[in-house]
């Protein structure tokens, strides 16, 4: 716990950290002594109640298109939360991707039965035998030759013809279906964070709004009761080449298989357009004609091929099914228009009465906390005063996920979600003299979170792919580069310079660039210049974390 406090103190006090390093280097005579002195200085520092520089609140909004548009990536199994100034916090979750009305390419019979077996034979030199069933496509037939003579009804010895037919009926089949990208339907749930009910992405009740996205209607508006309208413009990205893949459906299971493998299966089949279901092609692949004896020939059908197919499909991607529709994975790249959204309760006054904790603070898996409080004072509806402060109660830290929490009526529980900083902090609810002051310690590492966020940013840029880049104009190129730098390096930059003033950040960027330009080593020079330019760019350009944005399109 103390090591975590040291890390937090170092990140918030880069100036004092540099001074400690210089002091340790000056006092110590060996590398071991210098390292020991530096560790001792930083270990003592967190306990000295020195001047603390708090981390400012940030709105993590994906995209660099000003205040109106926000770019997000939705994936199955994940939830995206968007926050913007004076806008409600929204949860977006992609809950379902369905293939509607896939076209049947081919049907295969995997279990059959034989009935109405008939045999006709001829003696030598009497010609080929024939049956009327041979003209019926429902029957499977085979011509053979058999030894004939006096012992089995023929006057001459020699080879005589024999034909056997049996009616082929399929008991169980499997289908191969082709999915067209335009038949995919994406279901998204949009849920505003509300204090009245702790709304999450899968809440489709009072607060959540379910919308459908298809390639034909990629732009959709969602009316959020009490919060206005959000517009979504989405471009589906399944990551699958449906021209080369077929969905093999067997009863209530489905697999994604290669098209050519599916077409080469040695089983009786029907074209997908066949509506009769009886004129099977290659029926003989499931039928065995035994050796004929004079006027008799036995014919048997092979057993069910379902087990063999399950074995052959080992390792194939299994696709889930729901109500006859096929469910896919994949992701959506969406652009949100938030200019028609509004916050509830902006005109309410602050609550001045007493609050009590209904449910103790609970930590979520996302690094946030949820606390349930109840207002016992008068004057509702009103806004809930909520702050997260350092131990000296001088600097506001962390951020509020449930933007502008409000009390609609007295004694009604309200859920509030917030993200405290790593280490010790105070959660303060209400106003003096009846404030709730709750101490909280958040486990984890700021540096570890920095690298984790950087990896998520790089992954997001990879998912966005070519849609993240605009080469149509010079401005588009620079905007795309800015988006990439912000997505990937924004977390490292924020953690490294969280306690440094704007002027000092500019100066550090200039110094790094100047050192790089004057370095004799080519590799070192290029590296330092790139680091300096990225540092300057992330400081000078506003990239949706904090600051002001001017939208020339809305002038």
Swiss-Prot record:
Residues annotated as transmembrane = 8-28, 35-49, 495-515, 522-542
| This protein's UniProt keywords | Clathrin-mediated endocytosis of virus by host, Cleavage on pair of basic residues, Disulfide bond, Fusion of virus membrane with host endosomal membrane, Fusion of virus membrane with host membrane, Glycoprotein, Host endoplasmic reticulum, Host membrane, Host-virus interaction, Inhibition of host innate immune response by virus, Membrane, Secreted, Suppressor of RNA silencing, Transmembrane, Transmembrane helix, Viral attachment to host cell, Viral envelope protein, Viral immunoevasion, Viral nucleoprotein, Viral penetration into host cytoplasm, Virion, Virus endocytosis by host, Virus entry into host cell, Zinc
What residue spans carry the region label Fusion peptide? 147-160
List all annotated glycosylation positions.
116, 202
UniProt keyword Nucleotidyltransferase, yes or no: no
Q: What GO cellular-component annotations does this UniProt entry give?
A: extracellular region; host cell endoplasmic reticulum membrane; membrane; viral envelope; viral nucleocapsid; virion membrane
**Gene Ontology annotations of biological process type:** clathrin-dependent endocytosis of virus by host cell; fusion of virus membrane with host endosome membrane; symbiont-mediated suppression of host innate immune response; virion attachment to host cell
Listed InterPro entries: Env_glycoprot_M_flavivir, Env_glycoprot_M_sf_flavivir, Flav_gly_cen_dom_subdom1, Flavi_E_Ig-like, Flavi_E_Stem/Anchor_dom, Flavi_E_Stem/Anchor_dom_sf, Flavi_Glycoprot_E_cen/dimer, Flavivir/Alphavir_Ig-like_sf
Topological region Cytoplasmic = 29-34, 516-521
**Which Cys-Cys disulfides exist here?**
52-79, 109-170, 123-154, 141-165, 234-334, 351-382
Site Cleavage: list residues.
Answer: 49-50, 544-545
Query: What free text does the record give on domains?
Result: The transmembrane domains of the small envelope protein M and envelope protein E contain an endoplasmic reticulum retention signal.
Under NCBIfam families, the record lists: flavi_E_stem
- For this entry, the protein name equals Genome polyprotein
> Which organism's genome codes for this protein?
Dengue virus type 2 (strain Thailand/TH-36/1958) (DENV-2)
The taxonomy runs:
Viruses, Riboviria, Orthornavirae, Kitrinoviricota, Flasuviricetes
